[in-house]
Structure formats: structure tokens, C-alpha cells
Amino acid sequence: MDKKPLDVLISATGLWMSRTGTLHKIKHHEVSRSKIYIEMACGDHLVVNNSRSCRTARAFRHHKYRKTCKRCRVSDEDINNFLTRSTESKNSVKVRVVSAPKVKKAMPKSVSRAPKPLENSVSAKASTNTSRSVPSPAKSTPNSSVPASAPAPSLTRSQLDRVEALLSPEDKISLNMAKPFRELEPELVTRRKNDFQRLYTNDREDYLGKLERDITKFFVDRGFLEIKSPILIPAEYVERMGINNDTELSKQIFRVDKNLCLRPMLAPTLYNYLRKLDRILPGPIKIFEVGPCYRKESDGKEHLEEFTMVNFCQMGSGCTRENLEALIKEFLDYLEIDFEIVGDSCMVYGDTLDIMHGDLELSSAVVGPVSLDREWGIDKPWIGAGFGLERLLKVMHGFKNIKRASRSESYYNGISTNL
């Protein structure tokens, strides 16, 4: 099925969805050659790329949202229209809303685990993020005598969680034909202990720390100045980034007191460095920073409350989209990560370039100037992008859950430490 452009999707529903998954009612919109100009019922205005592959278009096609804008007063009829998929024969089929975070339901001990999700938990390889279809298992018959087609042993919810925590991407275990838990669990524990022994003997480098060092070398070798800025920043910096109390992102800020907060991003201090270094150094000014950031993110496989970012930017000459895309390509080729670039928009910068690996967003990149620059005394063209290191590690090592790549006491280099 062909992917419909964004203007067709919003025209069909009369709704817009923000990056936080909030549904807004559209009061008026106009479509130019490549842009959509949108006025929401709540009074907000937006200019976005008319893309087939942006995050909002994907969410519209999958009929996913988190909540509705209270000021827009989205009606039940509007929501039902959003949740209804029209076929070519004009038949309507209701689809289920999938909201994040996903709630796991407890499984009774007497219930056997369904084959499909079990297969998914072990089918990923470290070198690829390609989705695979899982064949349906053959139905067993009373007279069946073939051991391979026998049903899987029953697993309780706690046993299932334990097995998933012990599995690694390299394990070639089909869980719908697995051994009983009392045999499988000690076998996996032994494998993980052997992994730790090899790691301690041969490597001893933490994945996250090594990636930070590799990224630092990449940018320093290309003429970028490394920055190390404070983790505690003035709350005023967040407001100057356009994050006021009325925005969803404001609710994600870890505030220490009324004047200080943990930085949710690296951009504010990099803005300050660009302005100050422009008075000192010849152009173009090229800087980068690798460091931790903090947000009250929803729990899930793609988000962390403490995460590590790399932001790089260049100001002055040579700040074109072509040069930005070339640098991003060189960076991700250096890390051996496949990607594609699609247009999108965000609350802070407006138009952005999303760097995607499959359905996983690795980065948002910007070609300045943007209206926000005036708040920071920047009046020259610039380019920049930010990447989450844990997401990069998730792709590089084939982890199912981003927590395996994070600062953690439960995992080391993706290996469970609870052995």
C-alpha cells in the first residue's frame, strides 16, 4: 500500500498530532508545494514538511495517540474518525489504540506463553534492525508423536521476565521449543558468566564509555572543539529554549529549585559557547559536547530518564544542508549504522531532519538560522544535530531494550549482572 502524504492524512481526520502524541483539532490549514501551514483550534500555529515518512504521518497510519488537547476540545466523533481505517470499498474497521507506555498484564501460572512474542525475544541479530515475520507454530494433534512440534513448557510471568533478562542477541534459542525453566535458567546463567569471564580477560571496556571516546576522537579529528558544560543549568535557559510551563516538555524537567534544573538537553550552553567563541576565533566555529541529560520520560524500550547525548554544531561558512547530511553520513558510517533522513518538525526548532534507523529515531538535525537564535544572540547561519548514545548502542549491538545500553547496575554491556 502506498504511503499517503501528511496533508492527505490530516485532511481525512481534521486532526494534528504533536511529537508528544497529543491530538489537536485543526481549525485551518493550507498546503504549498512542500509545506503545510496549520492553525489549531487551541490557537497554536505550525509549519511542517509535507512528508510521507515523518513521525506524525507514521502515527496517523498506525492510529496511535496518547491524549487529546484540552483547549482544542477534540470530540468523540473526531477521535472515532481518527481510529477508523477506511478501505477502498468504504468499509470501516475499528483498530485498537496502542498507547505508551505499554502495560504488561500479569499471566496466571497455569497459562502457557504465546509463541509469537517468545520468538520475537530472541530473533534479533546485532548487525541489523530488520523486522521479521514469525511463522505460526503448527497445531499439535492428540496423535502427534514428533517432539519438535510439542507445545512449549508453561512459563509464569516472572519466569518469562527472568529468561528475557538473561538472553543475549547471540543466543540461538527458540523459546517455543525451549527446555523447562528449571533447565533453561541455569544454562543461560552459565552462558552469561562465561561472557563476563571473556569480557574481563580480553576487553574490560564499557560499551558506553568506549562509544564516548570513539565519538570524541571522530569530531576532534575533524576540527571540532570539545566542550564540557555544567549539568546543573539555570531554569531560565530552559525557558529561553521555548519550553515554558504550558508545554509538555516542561513536565519532563528535573527541577532542583526554582532557579536550577538538571539539563534536559545540551543545546543551551552550546548556544552560549557559539556566541562567545565567535568573538574570539576565526570562522567557522565548530564545537561538540558528549554528556548526560535528564528528562522525566515515560518508561519504555526507547526512553531513559538519564541518557547520554552528543551534540555537534558549526556556525559561519559552509553551513548548508548538503554539508550537514554529509557529516551525518560520515559519522554513522564510522559507527557502521544504516540510516535514512526524513523531514519533520519539532516545538523548539521548527523544521528538522530526522535520522532514522528503521522505525527508531536516532537524531534530529537542524539547518539554521531559526527564530530561536535571537534569544541567544546568534545571527549567523549554522548547522547541528544531536544523537542519543544509548540508542546508537541499541542499534550497534542488537539490544531489544535500551536499558541494556544505559548506565545501570542491572546490565553491563547488555549482560545481566543478576547471576
Swiss-Prot record:
| MF terms in GO | ATP binding; pyrrolysyl-tRNA synthetase activity; tRNA binding
Principal subcellular localisation of the protein: cytoplasm
Q: Which InterPro entries match?
A: aa-tRNA-synth_II, aa-tRNA-synth_II/BPL/LPL, Phenylalanyl-tRNA_Synthase, Pyrrolysyl-tRNA_ligase, Pyrrolysyl-tRNA_ligase_C, Pyrrolysyl-tRNA_ligase_N
Q: Give the superkingdom in one word.
A: Archaea
Per UniProt, the ranges with Polar residues bias are: 120-141
**Which key words are in the record?**
Aminoacyl-tRNA synthetase, ATP-binding, Cytoplasm, Ligase, Nucleotide-binding, Protein biosynthesis
Q: Does the keyword 4Fe-4S apply?
A: no
Q: Keyword Repeat, does the record have it?
A: no
Quote a single Gene Ontology cellular component term.
cytoplasm
For the biological process aspect of GO, one term held by this record is: tRNA aminoacylation for protein translation
EC no. given is: 6.1.1.26
Q: What Gene3D superfamilies does the record point to?
A: Bira Bifunctional Protein, Domain 2, Helix hairpin bin
The reactions it catalyses are:
tRNA(Pyl) + L-pyrrolysine + ATP = L-pyrrolysyl-tRNA(Pyl) + AMP + diphosphate
Chain positions covered by the region annotation Disordered? 100-157
**Which leading EC class covers this enzyme?**
ligase
Q: Quote the subcellular location field of this record.
A: Cytoplasm
Q: Where is the composition biased (Low complexity)?
A: 142-154
Q: Known HAMAP family for this protein? A: Pyl_tRNA_synth (MF_01573)
Which family does this protein fall into? Belongs to the class-II aminoacyl-tRNA synthetase family.
Question: What functional role does this protein have?
Answer: Catalyzes the attachment of pyrrolysine to tRNA(Pyl). Pyrrolysine is a lysine derivative encoded by the termination codon UAG.
**What is this protein's record name?**
Pyrrolysine--tRNA ligase
Q: Which organism is it from?
A: Methanosarcina barkeri
What gene does the UniProt entry assign to this protein? pylS
